[in-house]
């Protein structure tokens, strides 16, 4: 590889310093972080609610689970044209795409975990007079909590992947945009910087869960 194709760490650091001095680096980081946090929050809440509904209620599982399972297989970039037509090229479409990415891991883990809670434990709790919310927090919730945490961590990683897909198309700021702009201008140093920052951002957000 030439120095242009594979710049030294010194050049990558220099590129980051240059962007930081111009105020662009902080802007890219803040915007991408906002999109990940907002999209992840929306997707995770929807995944928890729908996953709990389908995991606990048999008719909902029979009616909706196959369709949701099929939608889960759709690649991230396939959603982009539809979201652009429905929502436009603004911020909402990017956050929505990130939310889609975060939704499926949470939904899948929660619904599967609740569906496999031992019915004997539930019946035993009912025999002791537990009903409604008290029953849910006593038996199913503790049983699925490890799966929920795993689902949230997977969702956060998936949100990062969908963030890049969202920012590669129709964005003027963010780490995904920095990737595309660096490629178009032959700035491999900035491109590698963006990759490193995405890795650091992913690691930091993963440490929160």
Residue ranges and their predicted role:
Residues 175-209:
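Hydrophobic alpha-helical transmembrane segments of polytopic membrane proteins
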Residues 1-42:
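Periplasmic/extracellular loop-to-transmembrane helix junction in inner-membrane transport proteins
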Residues 106-154, 175, 179:
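Short cytoplasmic-facing helical segments at TM-TM junctions of multi-pass membrane proteins
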Residues 27-36, 85-106, 144, 190-195:
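Loop-to-helix entry region at the N-terminal start of transmembrane alpha-helices
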Residues 26, 30, 34-54, 197, ...:
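Hydrophobic alpha-helical transmembrane segments of multipass integral membrane proteins
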Residues 49-85, 98, 108-115, 122-123:
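Cytoplasmic-entry segments and transmembrane alpha-helices of multi-pass inner-membrane transporters
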Residues 25-29, 33, 63-71, 110, ...:
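Hydrophobic alpha-helical elements at and bordering transmembrane segments
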Residues 96, 100, 132-166, 189, ...:
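Transmembrane alpha-helices
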